[in-house]
UniProtKB/Swiss-Prot annotation:
This is Chaperone protein DnaJ. Zn(2+) 1 binds at C147, C150, C200, C203. It comes from Herminiimonas arsenicoxydans. The gene is dnaJ. Residues 5-70 form the J domain. CDD domains: DnaJ (cd06257), DnaJ_C (cd10747), DnaJ_zf (cd10719). One of its GO terms (molecular function) is ATP binding. Zn(2+) 2 binds at C164, C167, C186, C189. InterPro entries: DnaJ, DnaJ_C, DnaJ_domain, DnaJ_domain_CS, HSP40/DnaJ_pept-bd, HSP_DnaJ_Cys-rich_dom, HSP_DnaJ_Cys-rich_dom_sf, J_dom_sf. It is found in: Cytoplasm. Its cofactor is Zn(2+). Pfam families: DnaJ, DnaJ_C, DnaJ_CXXCXGXG. Participates actively in the response to hyperosmotic and heat shock by preventing the aggregation of stress-denatured proteins and by disaggregating proteins, also in an autonomous, DnaK-independent fashion. Unfolded proteins bind initially to DnaJ; upon interaction with the DnaJ-bound protein, DnaK hydrolyzes its bound ATP, resulting in the formation of a stable complex. GrpE releases ADP from DnaK; ATP binding to DnaK triggers the release of the substrate protein, thus completing the reaction cycle.
Amino acid sequence: MAKRDFYEILGLGKNASDEEIKKAYRKLAMKHHPDRNPDSKGAEDKFKEAKEAYEMLSDPQKRDAYDRYGHAGVDPNMGGGGGGGGFADAFGDIFGDIFGQAGGGRGGRGGPQVYRGADLRYNLEITLEQAAHGYDTTIRVPSWDSCETCDGSGAKPGTSPINCTTCGGHGQVRMQQGFFSVLQTCPKCHGSGKINPSPCTACSGAGKIKRNKTLEVKIPSGIDDGMRIRSSGNGEPGMNGGPPGDLYVEIRIKQHAMFQREGDDLHCEIPISFAKAALGGEIEVPTLNGKASFTIPEGTQSGKTFRLRSKGIKGVRSGYAGDLFCHVVVETPVTLTEKQKELLREFELLTIEGGSKHSPQTKSWKDKVKEFFE
């Protein structure tokens, strides 16, 4: 049975910090500890599973190997002295050697594998105004930097890495799997061809340290929710001289207090008074670029929509501005004075006398009700 992903076990993403990993493990350990669940075999299995995931992800060197090669990078039973993988694994390694290893690995049969660095993702939340007009900002991204103590060698200062004793410095081992003789990434040096008998204490032999990197991001005007901006070369560093991965900044737009966005169009509700709806007149409305106005006709009903062309958002791809749709909401007056109530009662009587002339929808509705009960 295939082993579960260590990050999935802890309920975390691959960008999780060391503190988040420790916190998630403690929570699961408390929940599934055998002493708290003496009669549950399932709880014991989950406890062991969480413990293994924590042991791997809390160690920088093991975590780096797992991030790059999956379980094969941290399982001593997968590779090394023969045996191991099944028929599908054999073919996977054959085709990997011909076309390049998964994840961007490449290299000759006699040398260490070269791997492209992993891509990173960063979620950035911005306002609707920033999305409409464009926005320049800086972000801090968790990333790996070369260890300053050992200059990236992974070896304790004053010592040097030596050729891996398992692969002889080639970064690969040849394994016999049935009728096939195949090359696999060395499980001891993880393809680097080197090992550190005296690892650097600052980076635990990884040659790199995780820290926040500050980057400038230019967000183009008109960008929409869910779009991504690629920052080439700002992902994780490659291995054995491989190129770095890319950083993808995924945009999330905050909900606006007034406008709702649909593509490049904007929608908003415009409350107007009962008198304004009846008499008509000019309405002033806000837009993302200042104020605008339009005229509503006499007798405007609640729910009527007015379209203001090119008052929406200029599309990041099309270059054309969308429209602003204003949905009128006729507001019923509240907290009236006696004088106002008196005038409204008089108005109501005049309206009744006028019949369908003043309230055609009310007359129509009353006729339908009458027919319904007859």
